[in-house]
Design a protein with these regions (language model features):
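Contiguous, structured surface segment used for ligand recognition
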Residues: 1-95
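Acidic/histidine-rich, surface-exposed loop or edge segments in extracytoplasmic proteins
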Residues: 40, 100-101, 166
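Second-shell loop/turn segments in exported
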Residues: 45-48, 101-105, 169-171
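Conserved, mostly hydrophobic/aromatic
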Residues: 50, 98, 119
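Aromatic- and acidic-residue-enriched carbohydrate-binding clefts of CAZyme catalytic domains
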Residues: 91, 135-179
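Boundary/entry segment of secreted carbohydrate-active catalytic domains
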Residues: 93-103
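A conserved hydrophobic secondary-structure block that centers on an alpha-helix together
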Residues: 101-134, 141, 176-178
């Protein structure tokens, strides 16, 4: 938010709702991933029983802002206002996930992080990350270095739906233990 608004982070934590601030209240009566978001002339109040509920409430709050909030450049002309609203929400399904198959098509660490950010925007809670298969081994195991030395790179990629037509370009990558 500070990047696109050109200011500092507007979130503060306090017992009382500060001017133009957000108050977070633990409410054990709400389901684990549920939340209540109340925006009125007094400020913003978020109620949840656990961390996931608070996270999903903040995602909803962010979605109430102009689309420029998802940008990477300052947008000083955007109307950085949140409309008055009352939202009570909880997921219908416990498992809400997406599959990322890096065994067949490698994604950089930054791309994986962006993928997870987009999952969070949509309040998905499970990443099914396919790290190994015949097409690639994508995780470093220091005891078995040949897994990545050999298994992380393929000699060529099929360029058509016809078997036997390859581009001749080596392709691949893997994630280090530090990453």
């Amino acid at each position: 938010v500070p990047t696109v608004t050109g200011g500092t982070n507007p979130v503060t934590v306090a017992d009382e709702v500060p001017a133009s601030g957000i108050r977070f209240v633990t409410d054990e009566s709400l389901p684990a991933e549920g939340y209540e978001l109340n925006v009125d002339g007094e400020g913003i109040e978020v109620r949840a029983s656990q961390f996931p509920g608070f996270l999903y409430a903040l995602q909803s709050l962010e979605q109430l802002l102009p689309a420029a909030v998802y940008g990477t450049e300052p947008a000083p002309d955007a109307a950085w206002e949140v409309p008055c609203v009352k939202i009570a929400d909880a997921p219908r399904f416990a498992y809400r996930g997406m599959h990322l198959d890096v065994a067949r098509h490698f994604f950089s660490v930054d791309e994986v992080k962006r993928y997870i950010d987009v999952m969070a925007i949509h309040k998905l809670n499970t990443l099914h990350w396919h790290l190994t298969d015949d097409q690639g081994w994508r995780i470093e195991i220091k005891r078995y270095p040949e897994l990545t030395a050999v298994g992380s790179i393929r000699k060529a990629t099929v360029v058509r739906k016809e078997w036997g037509t390859y581009d001749g370009t080596p392709y691949g990558g893997f994630y280090t233990q530090d990453e």
